[in-house]
Amino acid sequence: MDVLRTASARRTFKWQAAGILARTSWVCRSCRSQFVAPKAARRTLATSTTTTTPTAPDNKPFYVTTPIFYVNASPHVGHMYSMVLGDVLKRWQTLKGNQAILCTGTDEHGTKVQRAAIANDMDPKQFCDLNSAKFQELAAACRIDYDRFMRTTDQDHVEAVKHFWLLLKEKGLIYEAKHEGWYCVSDECFYPESQLEKRQDPFTGEVYVASIESGNKVEWIEEKNYHFRMTALKDQLLEFYKNNPDWIVPQTRMNQVVDWVTNNLEDLSISRPVSRLSWGIRVPDDESQTIYVWVDALINYITMAGYPYWPPGREHLGGWPVDVHVIGKDILRFHCIYWPALLLALDLPLPKRILSHAHWTMEKKKMSKSIGNVVNPFYAMERFGIDTMRFYMIHNGGIANDADYSNDWLTVEYKKHLQNGVGNLSARVTRPKQWSLRRAVQSYQDGNMLLQSTGEQINDSCVEHITRLDKLASTIDNEMLQLNPSHALQKIMGLIGETNAFISNAEPWVIVKKQDSEALVDRIILTAGESLRIAGILLQPFMPDKAAQLLDLLGVENHNRTFHHARPLVDATYGTAFRTFGKEGIFPPPILDDIKGMGPDAGSKKHSSGNKPSSGNKKPTA
């Protein structure tokens, strides 16, 4: 863990040195006016919000976040999905030549963590150190290119939270009162009675009250604590949602948020008595109260961007406002109601977009340790490979609807798209001795090949294919701008399928046997090679290692692997492999073709057999 934290510190230092995260020491009360706009210049609570977010200056980095993950349990495949989604979005911007930053990390305070530490007979901080390291290991294992691994126990974050609290208090938005209600430890929040139902444990017969939304048990709590006047911001929130209907992806979740704010918005309890929750950030000026974990956690996003040390109007240097928050659908309310309300209260810019993804299930059931159907991402990557898992997560993962995880289906997808798709096409283009990709590229460069319609079927098929290639990068970019990486990846793989069909129909292995066939064969191989080269460039954010191997196999120079080069006939230097990959190629056959294991050891050599997928399990809902 020390090595990982050192790497994180180096990344943070790099941004500081570049002027991106300009930090000073803690801002005292007497100096705060230097960093916070005067009251006269601040918006009042009644001021309307009519734009999505301010137009950021050109030097603002594209800022992506994943959720910060609770350390009360080990990482699972759902955590990996959030991380990979965020990583793909960041890498896409980097591919386009834009400055981009990614923040991930761990949420280390709260009742859940406190109870888990006690259950493990550990000091809370030691417990957090141990489990936070597991998430750092996951990020490293699945090649997450983060710029900071945030921990809510980090001192700069603790200071940011206290500063935020004091400003809310200064504006009269915090008051103390008795609070009573149904509290869910698992979800770390109170629920109104309208959001509760009675349930019965199928094993013990116990009847209990649970959240309709999450299904987790709630308990009745009566205590005195601090509240945030969130209802004072109701009109501003609703106006913001109205003016920014595409703020949340998918659209259906925006409807849920608007309905909640319209019908259920209450002032928010934002502290807990130390007698009940001692593990957390203490309320400034009141050591008897601990700041509510979700207020603490949400502020991590602006801590990363340098808050509270922003000279007026310069928050963009640290990346704020965030361009995309990647979250799971289970934390929608916190990010789309509580968070914008807190930001509006302090006149801070709101996030530009929220990508709220669905969950991974097993045989249409929620993954649960008690059932034994939780997929361990480390074992899965060991079995299938890092980039195969990244591919499967994005290609088959759900945004609007849950996706069903299946080792059987993962193997099917691997064979179809990677082994028989990319692998087969790369072998067809680069291996045969009857033709040469380099010769084909050079022939076009020398002006010996004119790609224009002649009325001859194979030649015209080449021209049509090249024309489609010319539109691909912009099509994929549009999908990414719409926060739909799954569709983007599916369209790239569609190109691979089309190119395999093209080369099968053209049959260069037949044509090459004919006299004076070299020019036509070169035309076919160049067309297929261009498809592979462009696909390899566009696949880099999704499968960084395998895409690099593909481009090495094609002999594409590093400086020619940018989004600008994802157009046909712009690289005249490739065609001679930098390295080869043996008989099995880039995508060898799966370790086991008959994998049936569905449990927590999925992908592990230790795993034998588990539950079979349901007979109706075809393709996960995307």
Curated annotation (Swiss-Prot):
Q: Which reaction does it catalyse?
A: tRNA(Met) + L-methionine + ATP = L-methionyl-tRNA(Met) + AMP + diphosphate
Give the Enzyme Commission number: 6.1.1.10
In alphabetical order, the GO MF annotations are:
ATP binding; methionine-tRNA ligase activity
Q: Where in the cell is it found?
A: Mitochondrion matrix
Q: Which residues bind ATP?
A: 369
Q: Which UniProt keywords apply?
A: Aminoacyl-tRNA synthetase, ATP-binding, Ligase, Mitochondrion, Nucleotide-binding, Protein biosynthesis
Tell me where on the tree of life, at the top rank, the source sits: Eukaryota
Q: Where is this motif: 'KMSKS' region?
A: 366-370
State the residue spans of region: Disordered: 592-622
Bias type Low complexity, positions: 610-622
Segments carrying motif 'HIGH' region: 67-79
Cellular component (GO) terms are: mitochondrial matrix; mitochondrion
Kindly list the biological process annotations in GO that this record carries: methionyl-tRNA aminoacylation
**What coarse category fits the chief subcellular location reported for this protein?**
mitochondrion
SUPFAM superfamilies from the entry? Answer: Anticodon-binding domain of a subclass of class I aminoacyl-tRNA synthetases, Nucleotidylyl transferase
Spell out the NCBIfam families in the cross-references.
metG
What family is reported?
A: Belongs to the class-I aminoacyl-tRNA synthetase family.
| PANTHER family (alphabetical) | METHIONINE--TRNA LIGASE, MITOCHONDRIAL, METHIONYL-TRNA SYNTHETASE
Give the protein's recorded name.
Probable methionine--tRNA ligase, mitochondrial
Q: Which organism is it from?
A: Neurospora crassa (strain ATCC 24698 / 74-OR23-1A / CBS 708.71 / DSM 1257 / FGSC 987)
